[in-house]
């Protein structure tokens, strides 16, 4: 039993790390896996801490860039504007997420069919956007104007619906607002840092009375898998989307969403 629990923890950590930064909805995948496979033994502490593994993955890959930003911040106006832009983009999710946290977790997260619908809708949107003949105006995340950042931030709030995808909403929003594919994915990475850290801190605070570290081995295994797989995705995603776009992720969403919907209709 312990061995299978460790496999479960490794699998869930792997899914979290692989899907957190690509536009397929990590939350949607984890909810469907939990519903169909009954993976519930890991508990709230596990859920919170594998998110931390994904957060540390992106921070480790971007550590050199973050250090350079911190060094340039006092003397470079462009760097200060970029940091302000990321914070501006983060604000809508911070405010709306805090206000609607109970509804999101208590209602939306209990609806597997909604997850499947959102996966399918998001898949069609990704395929549509990937085929558009867009003429990007912004090729560097440092050059995003503040109004564009704010608009991306509001679009990110759609990801509070499970199955939408935080990275998917920000990437599609960035593309439609004039960014090229590489910078759209990279801005999604930067925006993930405060958004995921804020969500992690808020979940940790809300769950402080029920957290338990009794299953320490499961938590460690899930955390490590989320970290390793997250590092892999962050290191390779920008080059991939620059060459191939987002069609693969669109098709993946359609397959998973359709299969999940069929399974719900047949087995419930």
Curated annotation (Swiss-Prot):
GO terms for biological process: cell wall organization; peptidoglycan biosynthetic process; regulation of cell shape; response to antibiotic. InterPro entries: UppP. It holds the Pfam family BacA. It is an enzyme of class 3 (hydrolase). The chain crosses the membrane at residues 11-33, 46-66, 84-104, 107-127, 144-164, 185-205, 213-233, 246-266. The keyword Iron-sulfur does not apply. NCBIfam families: PRK00281.1-2, undec_PP_bacA. Bacitracin is thought to be involved in the inhibition of peptidoglycan synthesis by sequestering undecaprenyl diphosphate, thereby reducing the pool of lipid carrier available. This is Undecaprenyl-diphosphatase. It comes from Brucella suis (strain ATCC 23445 / NCTC 10510). The gene is uppP.
């Amino acid at each position: 039993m312990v061995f299978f629990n460790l496999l479960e923890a490794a699998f869930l950590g792997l899914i979290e790390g692989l899907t957190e930064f690509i536009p397929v909805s990590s939350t949607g995948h984890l909810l469907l896996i939990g519903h169909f496979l009954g993976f519930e033994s890991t508990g709230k502490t596990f859920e919170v801490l594998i998110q931390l593994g994904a957060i540390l993955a992106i921070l480790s890959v971007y550590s050199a860039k973050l250090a350079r930003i911190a060094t340039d911040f006092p003397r470079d106006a462009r760097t200060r504007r970029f940091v302000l832009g990321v914070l501006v983009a983060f604000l809508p999710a911070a405010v709306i997420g805090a206000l609607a946290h109970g509804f999101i977790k208590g209602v939306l997260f209990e609806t597997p069919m909604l997850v499947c619908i959102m996966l399918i809708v998001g898949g069609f949107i990704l395929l549509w956007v990937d085929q558009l003949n867009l003429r990007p105006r912004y090729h560097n995340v440092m050059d995003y104007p503040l109004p564009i950042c704010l608009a991306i931030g509001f679009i990110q709030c759609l990801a509070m619906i499970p199955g939408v995808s935080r990275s998917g909403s920000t990437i599609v929003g960035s593309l439609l607002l004039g960014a090229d594919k590489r910078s759209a994915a990279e801005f999604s990475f930067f925006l993930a840092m405060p958004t995921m850290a804020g969500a992690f801190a808020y979940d940790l605070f809300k769950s402080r009375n029920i957290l338990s570290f009794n299953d320490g081995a499961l938590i460690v295994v899930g955390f490590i898998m989320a970290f390793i797989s997250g590092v892999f995705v962050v290191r390779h995603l920008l080059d991939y989307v620059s060459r191939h776009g987002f069609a693969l992720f669109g098709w993946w969403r359609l397959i998973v969403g359709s299969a999940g919907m069929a399974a719900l209709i047949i087995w419930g």
